[in-house]
Amino acid sequence: MSELTHVRADGSAHMVDVTAKAETSRTAVAEGFVRTRADVVDKLFTADLPKGDALPVARVAGIMGAKKTPEIIPLCHPLPLGKITVDFERLPDGVRIEASVKTRGVTGVEMEALTAVTTAALTVYDMIKAVDKMAVIDGVRVLAKTGGKSGDWSV
């Protein structure tokens, strides 16, 4: 089993030293879902919600979330993010959200991709809760990453 890099021998947390690492191109893709009723899906994709057109707002929120990741996840390194995309796929029971993040840096962007997805999902939830208080956010996960010492992988 590998050691946790954010925990010192005495058990205290610290920010990992990445100053000696080589700068490489890195990407991460994450997904998440907002589950809701079919009639709410229709409203979501026709911009017919009481709070307005949710998907453009959620896209911008996801992008902002990725950029703010080191401010809300305590041990994340601030990174120069070169590209962030947030996309939506209509499903019969909700919406699938996918975020892709790219950088050239010394550490990966998985947390930024996850934060983009969750921030977008929270925004969708906020904008549909007036019409569906039972909506659910689920299935948030990293789908793929490239670059860095651990190499490339995908689910």
Swiss-Prot record:
Catalyzes the conversion of (8S)-3',8-cyclo-7,8-dihydroguanosine 5'-triphosphate to cyclic pyranopterin monophosphate (cPMP). This is Cyclic pyranopterin monophosphate synthase. Pfam families: MoaC. Pathway: Cofactor biosynthesis; molybdopterin biosynthesis. GO terms for biological process: Mo-molybdopterin cofactor biosynthetic process. Disulfide bonds: none annotated. Homohexamer; trimer of dimers. It comes from Corynebacterium efficiens (strain DSM 44549 / YS-314 / AJ 12310 / JCM 11189 / NBRC 100395). It catalyses: (8S)-3',8-cyclo-7,8-dihydroguanosine 5'-triphosphate = cyclic pyranopterin phosphate + diphosphate. Substrate binds at L75, C76, H77, M111, E112. Its EC number is 4.6.1.17. Belongs to the MoaC family. The active site is at D126. GO terms for molecular function: cyclic pyranopterin monophosphate synthase activity. Keywords: Lyase, Molybdenum cofactor biosynthesis.
